[in-house]
Amino acid sequence: IYTSYDTFIIDLWGVIHNGIKLNSKAIEAVDNLMKNKKKVIFLSNAPRPSSEVKKFLNELKMDNQYLKNILTSGEAAMQALQEKKYGKFFFHLGPKRDDSVFFKIKENKTNLEKCNFILCTGLFDDGEDDLNYYKELLKNHTDKKLICTNPDLTVHRGDVKEYCAGSIAKLFESMGGEVIYFGKPYKEIYKMCFRSGEKTIAIGDNLNTDIRGANNMYIDSIFISNGVHRAEF
């Protein structure tokens, strides 16, 4: 397959790793692509800057030679936040580990009542499995925009399913709120990865983001069936 394409846009979580360890077969495939002078871009819906994801991959013992091109939804959102596109003051809905996405504007962080918009990077606690708390939390704030830095609904950390920011975003929309998404499957982030005319293929495990995103850009895709949808097959 690889001889037909110039550029490979590859998802990370569910393809390269499972949140706990690397997929050795996937690393071998990436190594072969690079040896054949193919352009490899890791495109992730991680709600953190690309540099933070690189650190995480280093902790999983992924070699730096593979990590030259990483783009995250958090990185794209961070650029927009610094331009104050949605107002100045924000409320952060998500775990503390995602604070790096707003590090440069951290002085503008405030509470729900005073904020101009809601910055959603996920649930407060990875282990939560009930979204009713968030429905109560947000019910009086649907007049504000919610910025979703990870459109994924769920992810598997090892064998454990966890909610992502996308699940809160969908809940917020169902309550009548407006959501602005950064990341896959939306076209803007793909335009940062390749130019028109490049023979490009996307590889991912999420039908709603990876494969839909490829379809939105009219590029080919490879679906990894033993990732986030594995229980459905």
Language model region names:
Residues 2-35, 41-46, 51-71, 75-233:
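Asp-based, Mg2+/Mn2+-dependent phosphohydrolase catalytic module
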